[in-house]
Amino acid sequence: MSTVFPEDSVGLVVPQTARFDEPLALACGRSLASYELVYETYGTLNASASNAVLICHALSGHHHAAGYHAATDRKPGWWDSCIGPGKPIDTNRFFVVSLNNLGGCNGSTGPSSVNPATGKPYGAEFPVLTVEDWVHSQARLADRLGIQQWAAIVGGSLGGMQALQWTMTYPERVRHCVDIASAPKLSAQNIAFNEVARQAILTDPEFHGGSFQDQGVIPKRGLMLARMVGHITYLSDDSMGEKFGRELKSDKLNYDFHSVEFQVESYLRYQGEEFSGRFDANTYLLMTKALDYFDPAATHGGDLAATLAHVKADYCIMSFTTDWRFSPARSREIVDALMAARKNVCYLEIDSPYGHDAFLIPTPRYMQGFSNYMNRIAI
């Protein structure tokens, strides 16, 4: 019996792997002699290869952005609400590419991959990466797919930083940049949150200096704590209050330090437990450092407008009112710099109670604004 997927789903998708044997020079001064990128595509590339859209993922994201890998999958890809027939990124119009970034832990070459020089996992020996390193690796994937110029590059959070970096590093190769819930650089507070998360991992006795795979263990406790800290910053006070309030798991207090008493405690522990079973600790360290290091305006003395002076793309910048991790003020910094540089930009600030995670939640105004912009650029 055939499985019936929703009409607006891309249906079953099969991940693909691209191998690159040309060395990739990295910002840290090291290089990778070879590497692999896992990716998925949705829709059809037109004859002129002018309808391609690149999806850049956030910290814990991956290549599986839409559709299903098997009929038995409980959930579709992480951005299925935005990718598919009739959705904002309409696969009847666009050819969509979504990849797992270099350094990831979902098939692309990363710390958990085998280092061909040693026959063991890279672990902590995997080089530190930057957003621009990812962009260079993504450009090679575009070359492999025969895509000279992207109709649009779209990303939320860390993905938005990649989209912005693309327009600066390869200005002729991007027509539109859709940057959602992002920032031109991290604030001191954001760097601090990342450092707390890293210390949770680094001080876990099971981390073993990053060589935990050799020991047959994982730093589960550290990963759990890192995820719990991060997850709090992705939500808003309003959404947490609405979802959990001060509700107890049972009808009484236990007056101890070990019981899970509040519903919000139970939720955070569940999120941490689930995350620690599927994500690599070294990848988490890499991703947070890439976030911390992102500061493209540093090359122009902190002047973002000067940094953007040479870009060719048009921009759509979106933010959410209760996002305190990357607040609307941070998005407006990008908008102001683009206007000062006399670039085409539209800005949508969306009233949403969901905090930073709002870019993943298909609220009506968000979907309408997103669709309106993508409809304007469809070939």
Swiss-Prot record:
One of its GO terms (biological process) is methionine biosynthetic process. It catalyses: L-homoserine + succinyl-CoA = O-succinyl-L-homoserine + CoA. Residues 51-360 form the AB hydrolase-1 domain. Pathway: Amino-acid biosynthesis; L-methionine biosynthesis via de novo pathway; O-succinyl-L-homoserine from L-homoserine: step 1/1. Its EC number is 2.3.1.46. GO terms for molecular function: homoserine O-acetyltransferase activity; homoserine O-succinyltransferase activity. It is an enzyme of class 2 (transferase). The record marks 325 as: Important for acyl-CoA specificity. Gene3D superfamilies: 1.10.1740.110, alpha/beta hydrolase. InterPro entries: AB_hydrolase_1, AB_hydrolase_fold, HAT_MetX-like. One of its GO terms (cellular component) is cytoplasm. It is found in: Cytoplasm. Keywords: Acyltransferase, Amino-acid biosynthesis, Cytoplasm, Methionine biosynthesis, Transferase. Substrate binds at residues 227, 357. The active site is at residues 157, 323, 356. Transfers a succinyl group from succinyl-CoA to L-homoserine, forming succinyl-L-homoserine. NCBIfam families: homoserO_Ac_trn, PRK00175.1. Homodimer. Belongs to the AB hydrolase superfamily. MetX family. This is Homoserine O-succinyltransferase.
